[in-house]
């Protein structure tokens, strides 16, 4: 491609809306342009990268025995109602009606569609196993779109589904997909790790996320310092810290005027936050739920939602709801006598002695409270783990890092096949539900994650296999006929070799062209300058290294060498 013919617009200034490096660079390098909040148009350069990632995904999925097809993005409500998710998915689903007043949605995910296709097409165990996938645009009405394509309302995703006759078949399909995902992310140049995860709204049992470590990641990921254990913090079990046993004392009401925060309470009572139990009140659809945690702990909303069961939306209760539940101002809630539908008590609180709680009375707290004697609830693990707690597998210490999810694999089991009546006839002539697996990759999020891991102060540094162009050929002075002619000859020869080459034939200064080539992340640069009269050009790698002066024939071999180094063929 010649840049004089390209729709490309690089930006020198960082757009005010962009918060993270990938968002900044995707806009500055001309990969995409914003149309509305969380909605982007992909420019030619960005689309080439997306297509390269798609091709990697296709190759690895096909190699693992999966078949590609394309489902409709517009889905009738009936399918979602069959699975019970039409109401369960919540406000993130884009819903619409056709001219006949029939309900539809723009697909945020496609379990129901795939299940419907397979129940109509597959009748016998002889037609199994089956693994289908598609690469398609998905739609989710995010409450707060941010970070560019990391959390957008429209995004490209590969979603695949396996159908087996038994658990053994599912386990095999799941492992094939896990290996395929490892290959995909390695080829994309990503340092990604599979971690244990919660199944969320998708449902099912076994689940793993492929996480990319990132300082701006939206997820906290728990890693063991000694073994291979890794899990999303939503999933990681906490290790309760047992308090020293004490003789139970009588409950005492204490006036605490305007003392609401844990920090202020600890100062007021001259105690550690570990001696305080805080009561958080949530609205879980139509239920009011109170959760009691040790004062220094953070609530884990996924664990809480799982304990409640079938929750569409979980959020902190309004001030009005808190007052109705406690009869007091916000900041004085406690588990004794609270009026809620469900009371959850973290296992750590159940093992504390003589602790402090809100009295459900404005400006009042209770001390010397003990679980079992003074109140009871559903005891469980409802908090986030913290650095230094014990690994659930080896007992050594854990650490926590930020991460971005780029892929997710699930063992769905029969969740959808049973609810939608999707069955096959087994060897004994009996109807049985398909055993399903689900496998997703965020294609556009993967592109952004590659940029997050591969950039410097000058711009993007694309890994060779995903780069929009492999080589940028730059005539230093397009007005110099010899430079312009030789640059085009080199460009044409590279294309004959199978190299994606970009000829910067714009009437711009060489410095502008160099900056744009670096900003766009082109892995190799060949400059045709004053030394062309001696048959020599300059070669430079985007990811570092010195400028090399080579003959024209040598530069072709140098390009080949980079492909060989990356195990790529021409």
Swiss-Prot record:
GO terms for biological process: prolyl-tRNA aminoacylation. Gene3D superfamilies: Anticodon-binding domain (3.40.50.800), Bira Bifunctional Protein, Domain 2 (3.30.930.10). Its EC number is 6.1.1.15. GO terms for cellular component: cytosol. It is found in: Cytoplasm. Consists of three domains: the N-terminal catalytic domain, the editing domain and the C-terminal anticodon-binding domain. Belongs to the class-II aminoacyl-tRNA synthetase family. ProS type 1 subfamily. NCBIfam families: PRK09194.1 (NF006625), proS_fam_II (TIGR00409). Homodimer. This is Proline--tRNA ligase. It comes from Clostridium perfringens (strain SM101 / Type A). The gene is proS.
């Amino acid at each position: 491609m010649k840049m004089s013919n390209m729709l490309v617009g690089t930006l020198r200034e960082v757009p005010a809306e962009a918060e993270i490096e990938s968002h900044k660079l995707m806009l500055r390098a001309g990969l995409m342009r914003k149309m509305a909040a969380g909605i982007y148009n992909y420019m030619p350069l960005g689309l080439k990268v997306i297509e390269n990632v798609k091709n990697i995904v296709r190759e690895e999925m096909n190699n693992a025995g999966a078949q590609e097809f394309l489902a409709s993005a517009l889905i009738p409500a009936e399918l979602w109602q069959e699975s019970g998710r039409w109401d369960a998915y919540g406000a993130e689903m884009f819903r619409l009606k056709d001219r006949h007043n029939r309900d539809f949605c723009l697909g945020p995910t496609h379990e129901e569609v795939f299940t419907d296709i397979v129940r109509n097409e597959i009748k016998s165990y002889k037609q199994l196993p089956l693994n289908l996938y598609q690469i398609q645009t998905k739609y989710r009405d995010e409450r707060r779109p941010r970070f560019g394509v990391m959390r957008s309302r429209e995004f490209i995703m590969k979603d695949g589904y396996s159908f087996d006759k038994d658990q053994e078949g599912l386990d095999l399909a799941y492992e094939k997909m896990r290996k395929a995902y490892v290959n995909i992310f390695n080829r994309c140049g990503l340092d990604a790790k599979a971690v244990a995860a919660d199944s969320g709204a998708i449902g099912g049992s076994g689940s793993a996320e492929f996480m990319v470590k990132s300082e701006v990641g939206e997820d906290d990921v728990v890693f063991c310092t000694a073994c291979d254990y890794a899990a999303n913090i939503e999933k990681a079990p906490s290790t309760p810290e047992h308090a020293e046993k004490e003789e139970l004392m009588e409950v005492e009401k204490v006036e605490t005027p305007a003392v609401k925060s844990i920090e202020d309470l600890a100062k007021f009572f001259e105690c550690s936050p570990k001696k305080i139990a805080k009561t958080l009140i949530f609205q879980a659809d139509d239920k009011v739920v109170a959760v009691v945690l040790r004062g220094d702990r953070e609530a884990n909303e996924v664990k809480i939602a799982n304990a409640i069961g079938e929750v569409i939306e979980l959020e902190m209760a309004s001030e009005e709801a808190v007052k109705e539940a406690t009869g007091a101002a916000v900041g004085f809630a406690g588990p004794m006598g609270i009026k809620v539908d469900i009371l959850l008590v973290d296992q750590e609180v159940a093992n504390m002695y003589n602790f402090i709680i809100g009295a459900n009375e404005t400006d009042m707290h209770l001390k010397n409270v003990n679980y079992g004697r003074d109140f009871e609830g559903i005891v469980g693990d409802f908090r986030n783990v913290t650095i230094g707690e014990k690994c659930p597998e080896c007992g050594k210490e854990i650490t926590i890092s930020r991460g971005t999810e780029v892929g997710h694999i699930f063992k769905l089991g029969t969740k959808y096949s049973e609810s939608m009546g999707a069955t096959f006839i087994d060897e004994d002539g009996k109807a049985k539900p398909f055993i399903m697996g689900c496998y997703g990759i965020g294609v556009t999020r993967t592109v952004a994650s590659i940029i997050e891991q591969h950039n410097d102060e000058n711009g993007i540094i694309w890994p060779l296999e995903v780069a929009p162009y492999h080589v940028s050929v730059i005539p230093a002075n397009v007005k110099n006929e010899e430079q312009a002619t030789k640059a085009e000859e080199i460009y044409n020869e590279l294309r004959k070799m199978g190299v994606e080459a970009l000829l910067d034939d714009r009437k711009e200064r060489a410095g502008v062209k160099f900056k744009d080539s670096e900003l766009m992340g082109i892995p190799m640069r060949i400059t045709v300058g004053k030394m062309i009269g001696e048959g020599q050009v300059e070669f430079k790698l985007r990811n570092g290294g010195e400028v090399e002066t080579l003959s024209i024939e040598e530069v072709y071999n140098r390009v080949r060498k980079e492909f060989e180094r990356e195990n790529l063929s021409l």
